[in-house]
Amino acid sequence: MLGGLLAICSAACFAFNNASVRRAVLTGSIVQGMAITVPIGVPLFFIAALVTGNLAAVMGFSPTALAALSAAGVMHFVWGRYCNYRATRAIGTNLVAPIQQFNLLVTLVLAIWLLGEYLTPLKILGIALILLGPTVTMQKAKAAPGERAVSDEKITPIDAEKPAAFQPKYAEGYIFSLLSATGYGLSPVLVRVGLENQGIGVSLAGGLVAYIAATAAFALVLLWPGQWKHVWETDREAAKWFTFSGFLVFFSQMFLYMAMSVAPVTVVSPINRLSILFRLFFSRLLNPQHEVFGGSVILATVVSLLGAVALSLSTDVVQSLLPLPESMVTLLNWRWP
């Protein structure tokens, strides 16, 4: 249950981050955003590990663990984030979200193949419900493409401007959505390998390693001519929201790494998908003038939360709470592979 709760906290923070990034890219570029949101994780995780007394754990990681955590950082914070930003800019969040569900399948397949984890009927039900929740929302939005429920609220002067008609670049958006799914799908498995079941505290040290590797990798991008000048020209409004996003990403990843250290990937990753639903609420709060809002949000939220509960509950807990017939007990105890 703890792993599931931490995964939900991670999903909420990640969704808030998405809404913040959406505001930032109204006046800032992808490179400018990554130049702020990637490096900011290093001092934040350093402080968290130092305060909790887990900084020394960095030196205790095996070479394999260091390699796995470093690879996770590059795949998630650099590759996945860049592709996600590109896809969102090309086709918008509503079209990106259902395509990125592919990363869940990548994670589950790799977890079963490499980590020896398994599926149970409860996990399969939970996965199905979590995938169904966002699908309900996306299908509803697709059914009424002409509707655009936009709030009259004005948060900044940018909101006073009527947004231009959005022309999706489908090829670019779909390609980068799938590419981001590979990064986001592979990184949880690498984190699980790197943490080696060492507990919540050590996960903070693992996050520090991942962010250092990601920052070093992204620093190579800034060596390209003109990139440093471009970053220093970041708009003040964009810099504010990118910085806020960086803090939200830190909390999101901190909760995620803690969840991965105490719960199976097959539980944490699907629950983390709830961020797709949370972002609709945060978008309404932060971006009333710059997002498209569909219906069926409450239904989708309830369906996905039921899936999260199914994933968090163990078979033993269900059997202790409900008087089940022998045939049902046998079904619940089924495992694959």
Tell where the protein language model's regions lie, with residue ranges.
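Juxtamembrane helix-start motifs in multi-pass secondary transporters
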Residues: G33-M34, V96, S203-G207, V268
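Membrane-interface interhelical linkers
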Residues: M1-Q32, I36-A71, R81-I91, Q139-F176, ...
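Structural signature of transmembrane alpha-helices in multi-pass secondary transporters
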Residues: S10, G41, Q100-N103, S180, ...
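Membrane-helix interface/capping residues of multi-pass secondary transporters
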Residues: I30-V31, T93, L119, I200-S203, ...
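Hydrophobic/small/kink-forming positions within alpha-helical transmembrane segments
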Residues: A15, F46, G73-V78, L104-V109, ...
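C-terminal transmembrane-helix exit sites in multi-pass transporters
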Residues: L105-L125, T135-T137, A141, L277-L299
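Residue-level recognition of transmembrane alpha-helices
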Residues: T37-V38, Q100, K123, I127, ...
